[in-house]
From Swiss-Prot:
Localization terms from the record: Cytoplasm, Cytoskeleton
Broad class of enzyme this protein falls into: hydrolase
Enzyme Commission number(s): 3.6.4.-
Keywords noted in UniProt: ATP-binding, Cytoplasm, Cytoskeleton, Hydrolase, Nucleotide-binding
KW Hydrolase (keyword) present: yes
Protein name from the UniProt record: Actin
Organism domain of life: Eukaryota
Functional note: Actins are highly conserved proteins that are involved in various types of cell motility and are ubiquitously expressed in all eukaryotic cells.
Length: 378
């Protein structure tokens, strides 16, 4: 992957709790998008000589899910199992992108407020296991903002494992005002599993959960007025949709369609103490300097797969208008490519000429050790 002037393109790898997005800097979309899953056989090899692997990664794990136990090495946006994480990176470089990592600088992404030890471990694995020539760790929400063409704004980044509101001013995240909400796509999937059970549909295994995730992605939406929508659903069935399961049977989904994502705005429905995404965003803005709040209200950027529900931007706008000062201009931006905006921002950043002196080079790592990441990546 060399450019005309002999430069090697950087690799950009956005490791989400649910999906890995990976590709080459300068591209406008990731080449590889696959689930962040490592699967191990549930039963010892029945068929001798079938060449069964001890672990499967990504789509292969997904397709063999019937015989595997699936584990996600990234929980709530933070890596919790480094051995599995290494398998995912290995799979990304060698099987998905088909590159030799020792030949390319690598840009990785991390959750806001990622523990220091985690950044060091990422750095160490990249340099020592994969022998990369250079690497950098960027905060996910900041990359999403770059992808939307802004340097100031507040990003609501909601993925599969965690949601964050991150105020950013002139390209720098304001750590004191970042809020984290442990409520995201996976919780919505679990919630949908629960409310579908009330209808008598039983989904329990890790494999069946993936079916429910698909129902969520295809059929759910956010109601502008939840109470009103609930009332409507009790009187008419025009909101009902059918979904065909892998075995061909049809199930009917009604008010579950908007009840599922409603917990983003009312975590109380799940029995969670926390406040909803709109209030979290508002609290984040209020923690910022009074002079920059106007710029934040006017640049609320949605990012991540869990912001893909139809109706979410309008609802967000409505809820924030209700709590903000009445004269304040409020703008919620929901870019169509927001599912991949973290990756796209990484692709933009890693191909900027001004960024080239920001990389941590192998020589610097050899000299200073893993702690170099705190000095060079902020």
């Amino acid at each position: 992957m060399a450019d005309g002037d002999g430069e090697v393109s950087a690799l950009v790898c956005d490791n989400g709790s649910g999906m890995v997005k990976a590709g080459f800097a300068g591209d406008d979309a990731p080449r590889a998008v696959f689930p962040s899953i490592v699967g191990r056989p549930r039963h010892q090899g029945v068929m001798v000589g079938m060449g069964q692997k001890d672990a499967y990664v990504g789509d292969e794990a997904q397709s063999k899910r019937g015989i595997l136990t699936l584990k996600y090495p990234i929980e709530h946006g933070v890596v919790s199992n480094w051995d599995d994480m290494e398998k995912i990176w290995h799979h990304t470089f060698y099987n998905e992108l088909r590159v030799a990592p020792e030949e390319h600088p690598v840009l990785l992404t991390e959750a806001p407020l990622n523990p220091k030890a985690n950044r060091e471990k990422m750095t160490q694995i990249m340099f020592e296991t994969f022998n990369v020539p250079a690497m950098y760790v960027a905060i996910q929400a900041v990359l999403s903002l770059y992808a939307s063409g802004r340097t100031t704004g507040i990003v609501l980044d909601s993925g599969d494992g965690v949601s964050h509101t991150v105020p950013i001013y002139e390209g720098y995240a304001l750590p004191h005002a970042i809020m984290r909400l442990d409520l995201a796509g996976r919780d919505l999937t679990d919630n949908l599993m629960t409310i579908l059970m009330e209808r008598g549909y039983n989904f329990t295994t890790t494999a069946e959960r993936e079916i429910v995730r698909d129902i969520k992605e295809k059929l759910c939406y956010v109601a502008l007025d939840y109470e009103q929508e609930m009332a409507n659903s009790l009187t008419s069935s025009q909101n009902e949709k059918n979904y065909e399961l892998p075995d061909g049977q049809q199930i009917t989904v009604g008010n579950e369609r908007f009840r599922c994502p409603e917990v983003l705005f009312q975590p109380g429905l799940l029995g969670q103490e926390s406040v909803g995404v709109h209030e979290t965003t508002f609290n984040s803005i209020m923690k910022c300097d009074v002079d920059i709040r106007k710029d934040l209200y006017n640049n609320i950027v949605l990012s991540g797969g869990t912001t893909m529900f139809p109706g979410i931007a309008d609802r967000m706008s409505k809820e924030i208008t209700a709590v903000a000062p009445s004269s304040m201009k409020i703008k919620v931006v929901a870019p169509p490519e927001r599912k991949y905006s973290v990756w796209i921002g990484g692709s933009i950043l890693a191909s900027l000429s001004t960024f080239q002196q920001m990389w941590i080079a192998k020589a610097e790592y050899d000299e200073s050790g893993p702690s170099i990441v705190h000095r060079k990546c902020f």
